[in-house]
Amino acid sequence: MLKTPLKTLLDALTHHFTKERLVTLILTADEKLLIFMLEHENANDYKNAFFKMIANTLVFNQEALLECLEIKELEKSFTRFKNKIGLFSQGGFIKSSELVVLNFPFKDNVLLGNAKDNNTKSKELFYHEILHKKEIDTFLNKKALCHFEMHGEGDLENALKDKNTNYLIKGNNLIALHSLKKKFAKQVKCIYIDPPYNTGNDSFNYNDNFNHSSWLVFMKNRLEAAREFLSDDGVIFVQCDDNEQAYLKVLMDEIFLRENFVASIIWANKEGGGKSDSKHFRQKHEYIHCFAKNKEQTIIYGQAVEDIDRYKCSDKHENTRGKYQLVKLDSGSLGWIKSLDYPIELEGKTFYAGGDYDQWLDRQNGKARIKDWGWRWRWSKEKLEWGLKNDFIEIKENSNGEWNIYTKQYLNCDSDGNIKPRTLQPMALIEKHSNTQSNRHIKEMQLNFTYSKPEALIMDILNFSTNENDLVLDFFAGSGTTCAVAHKMKRRYIGIEQMDYIETITKERLKKVIEGEQGGISKKYGFKGGGIFVYAELKEVNLEIKRQITNANSASECLKIFKTLNERFLKRADCKIDEIDSEEFQNLDLNEQKRICCTSLDSNEDYLNLGDIDEDAWEIDEITKKYNEIFYS
């Protein structure tokens, strides 16, 4: 934290140099300006705010000082737009451009997002990235963990030392991400999140009443942090509905870069005709935007063939290749290529793609309209020779007495002869796995959560993007579907959830998974239970006190809790207890008294910084300190 407020530092500069002259001095890195700051009585604060260390050398950060000065005057801050939202380029709003960034109110802020339950609709706290840089650094420092629990066989200490351990963390997900990012940076293969959709209602168990700009800031902060977790070949899937999906896509273009966009998957999530609560179109789908950390290194895995009844034919290779189906070698819809339009002589017969010699001759002589008669073979001459040699080709007469060449498409062998289950390239359309299925599953587990995602949907996503033992992250863990599916599919996982139901729903669900519950994808994967996860919570400080104040039943109880606080908890140095003792305060209703007491507490200290864990005031026991040391080592 700065000992001197930024406003004081800026006022000293503008008083000494004048505002107009100061801008020129900053742009030219004038020696007089640098000497003034470095020899000032608040030199350390000037260094912390407007200089940075590069290769052990103190370097003047002109941009930081300029931005801070300009924001002080409210001339160039994004917040000047207030309620305007649009696409922004080269200093102004635009309708279209090759290069765009999403512009929205409070873009240069960090939104804490401290919802704890559905019933509390609190005003969310913004921190400005420039004017509150030090405050941001403080609340995004590593936080101490507490209430460690081991679930499954084994002991907690060894689990914390094991890099393959699964984790379920309770706490604000933005702060948790920043606490965990150094430990898990560049290790996560797949991130899946199902954030609040900004629907303006309580259709599921989130404090889902952000306004548009708040929601965008909320997502921006978390996506920027999440990107640091992804491995170079990692991918992120973000689920959304029509309320924000278009803005979310452009926001993700900015954070992950447009060239790393993979797909916008459509999931038909409702059975039957969909919801009819719109006067225009029925809604029965949601979106899942997928981006890669580096698209050049990312592999999207194919889906296993489900319609195996089509594979009816058998030959001498069945034990290794499995059964097969026949697929005609020629095609009229793949686009004509002259080198793939050649005559084939087999078993005393000559074959032409499309079956017509005259059309073939016209194609060769340039007389045919290729778009009408663009037949050709799917395999080259060399590939055909390989297929004949390795028994991948079959000639067969159809019911009309016509002979055709077919390739054998085996169930357990690819077209290059590699023995492995056949897969299909996944489609960006999922027309299965409804919310009805997931709601039924949740009820079977005797858990109370609305609109949990079906396990089969998350199974598809993890099949697209991961292999066994890959690490999966979900920082909107909700009812724990992602963690449960990862557990059953032998993936490692980290789940983060700040809502209080993590203890009664999310954690309880994962305990049932370890016990071997048979809903969802359990039977498909032959899952019988087992495995472990570690539960822990970010250590609350002011959050715990705020909760006590909120739950107080009387004004006297509220004041008693507040008055026992050490002065370190107070948000402002000029906040005086005697003002709370005033008659004016006493005349306020209880809820207003609670609000004033809670807002007087510094949100920087909602959670305990790891660096402060040894201070006696926090009364952290030695075993908890030890577990933190092991976890963060």
Give the role of each language-model region.
Residues M1-T18:
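Extended, Lys/Arg-rich, non-catalytic nucleic-acid recognition/anchoring regions
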Residues W267-S276, D460-N469, K488-Q548:
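Cysteine-dependent PTP/DSP-like catalytic domain, specifically the C-terminal lobe
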Residues G200, G480-A484:
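Glycine-rich SAM-binding Motif I of class I
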Residues K72-L471, E503:
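Class I S-adenosyl-L-methionine
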Residues A536, E544-E583:
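Charged, amphipathic alpha-helical linkers/stalks
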Residues A12, K19-E135, W379-W386, N390-E402, ...:
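Coupling/switch/interface segments within P-loop NTPase motor domains and analogous charged loops
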Residues E228, A484-V485:
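Hydrophobic/aromatic ligand-binding patch that stacks against planar heteroaromatic rings
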